[in-house]
């Protein structure tokens, strides 16, 4: 698989699965032995079922959940993406009742693409910012 093809697989996941909730595409793109190497808040398992469940929770809490991809780069089978997620908090999330607030947070993640399927994920999301926007923790005062 070429670098461009690997990037296209990851972009398709971001746009069609995360951004549109198309879980048929999820089934097509994710390897049966997928492993998420980054613990996700909420106790999701580190496998394909856990990733699908996380995506569904996010789309339920933020029905207009989508990402703006700022850039992607690949070294072969690993694709790194920097993106900003956005959405409107219209469903329960982290035990917080819907607030109607528009949220956004940045994420950098790496997905390994093997035989045209996403097989691994590592990532860092700015969940501190998300928690502040949902008033789970107080915003820092400006000096």
Residue ranges and their predicted role:
Residues 1-143:
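C-terminal and inter-domain tail/linker signature
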